[in-house]
């Protein structure tokens, strides 16, 4: 015999669930006025998630492990399993390992990286996975521009293609890119050292509102000259709590403080979200 009360309840529950999903989609599609950039608290590594006003998603690096998957679930709708662009700044484990997990779990449309050669097991796994992904592969070099709606991503480094070249230390091959949205700009530096910084500022005005500090705040990066050229209002340092490298270095912090730059750190502040309407920035952490 049919239990009409139970059947009615199940129908109402089903309709409510469908209605909730529809409204989530509607609200998601209508939020087209702000850029959101989240610097993940990913441990001793880097991972930055960017969502454009029209909901295109960019992931710069993936951190050292599968924690990135937990972070993405917090930022992306449960039905969305596509990332528009992944950027691997350089193939070191603390930037690359998490991307292997991402490639297993998400469809990726485009991959931007340097194409350099390294002799590590993780690197070989990376090459195998991106070849199977069926994504558009872009080899980074300066003067490239990637446009996504109102958002522009300009590649500042490396100055020329490094594809097919082998490096034991890949920090100085890191992709450095500047993202612009109307009147706001963000500079992402990977693990670029002072050597790369000097080459960049010799060619380019890097003025930006927000700087992702190079190499987790190591003394190898973020020279005073570079900071004066970038002239950021905000500096974000991505590093792990009580990390064995003692990042960030006290001299880097001193340089930032003396120049009056607001410092945010993932080891102290957790996930750091910066929202831009193209003119103003709001910090959530």
PLM ranges: what are they?
Residues 2-285:
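Non-globular, low-confidence helical/coil segments that flank catalytic cores
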């Amino acid at each position: 015999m049919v239990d009409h009360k139970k059947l009615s309840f199940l129908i109402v529950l089903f309709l409510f669930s469908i209605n909730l999903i529809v409204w989530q989609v509607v609200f998601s599609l209508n939020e087209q006025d702000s850029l959101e950039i989240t610097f993940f608290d990913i441990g001793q590594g880097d991972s930055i998630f960017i969502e454009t006003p029209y909901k295109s998603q960019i992931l710069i690096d993936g951190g050292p492990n599968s924690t990135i998957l937990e972070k993405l679930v917090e930022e992306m709708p449960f039905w969305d399993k596509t990332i528009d662009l992944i950027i691997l700044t350089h193939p070191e484990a603390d930037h690359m390992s998490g991307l292997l997990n991402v490639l297993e779990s998400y469809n990726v449309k485009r991959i931007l990286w340097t194409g350099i050669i390294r002799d590590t097991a993780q690197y070989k796994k990376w090459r195998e996975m991106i070849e199977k992904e069926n994504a558009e592969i872009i080899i980074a070099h300066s003067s490239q521009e990637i446009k996504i709606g109102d958002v522009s991503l300009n590649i500042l480094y490396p100055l020329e293609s490094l594809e097919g070249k082998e490096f034991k230390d890949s920090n100085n091959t890191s992709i450095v890119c500047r993202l612009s949205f109307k009147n706001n700009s963000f500079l992402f530096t990977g693990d670029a050292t002072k050597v790369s910084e000097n080459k960049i500022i010799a060619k380019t005005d890097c003025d930006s509102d927000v700087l992702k500090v190079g190499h987790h705040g190591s003394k190898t990066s973020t020279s005073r000259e570079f900071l004066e050229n970038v002239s950021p209002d905000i500096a974000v340092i991505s590093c792990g709590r009580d990390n064995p490298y003692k990042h960030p270095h006290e001299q880097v912090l001193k340089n930032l403080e003396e120049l009056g730059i607001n410092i945010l750190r993932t080891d102290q502040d957790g996930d750091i979200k910066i929202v831009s309407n193209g003119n103003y920035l709001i910090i959530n952490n």
